[in-house]
């Protein structure tokens, strides 16, 4: 068979298979493997949960205690909030929780080559408490960089997140069911 014919056949023969693949139902992607963290990463996990609890408890002093003095929030924005005092001031209304509740939890914490720096990330749920709020719930995500101080305490150095989007009842339920109170150490 001439080379041109072999080339044409090699191109045309797979086409029916591609057509079948296009109409076949897509398989669900495999579930992501569960995160397994070191004991040091679990310290950061616990600290992230403690930070979230400070907002849930409307405790401004505990919130501020989780921040490095020179922390930067909205770190990827053109005008980050810089410094513990400014951040605590800007978050005061959110910490009060009178019109908006924010809750979050880590889904992953990671420590790399520097044992005093860690990254945490996970989902965040915003609940608008105003009567008739639409949407009532919005889901986003956060990512934080933690620094372990000379006193051994982990504090946030940088924080940012993903713009929240309206959330369905199923997404809200999945968020609430996804919180793990114990770090998945492995």
Predicted regions and their residues:
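A beta-strand edge to alpha-helix "cap/lid" segment located at domain peripheries
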Residues: 27-65, 72-186
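Boundary at the C-terminal end of the N-terminal hydrophobic targeting segment
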Residues: 21-26
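N-terminal secretory signal peptides that target proteins for export/translocation
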Residues: 1-5
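Bacterial N-terminal signal peptides
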Residues: 9-20
């Amino acid at each position: 068979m001439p080379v041109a014919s072999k080339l044409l056949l090699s191109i045309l023969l797979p086409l029916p298979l591609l057509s079948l693949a296009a109409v076949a139902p897509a398989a669900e992607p495999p579930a992501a493997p569960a995160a397994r963290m070191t004991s040091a990463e679990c310290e950061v996990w616990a600290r992230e949960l403690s930070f979230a609890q400070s907002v849930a408890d409307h405790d401004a002093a505990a919130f501020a205690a989780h921040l490095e003095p020179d922390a930067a929030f909205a770190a990827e924005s053109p005008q980050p909030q810089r410094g513990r005092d400014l951040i605590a001031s800007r978050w005061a209304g959110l910490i009060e929780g009178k019109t908006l509740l924010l809750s979050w939890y880590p889904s992953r914490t990671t420590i790399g080559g520097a044992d005093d720096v860690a990254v945490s990330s996970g989902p965040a749920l915003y609940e608008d408490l105003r009567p008739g709020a639409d949407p009532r719930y919005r889901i986003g995500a956060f990512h934080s960089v933690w620094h372990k101080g000379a006193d051994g305490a982990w504090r946030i150095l940088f924080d940012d997140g993903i713009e929240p989007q309206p959330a369905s009842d199923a997404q809200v339920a999945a968020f609430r069911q996804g919180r793990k109170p114990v770090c998945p150490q492995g």
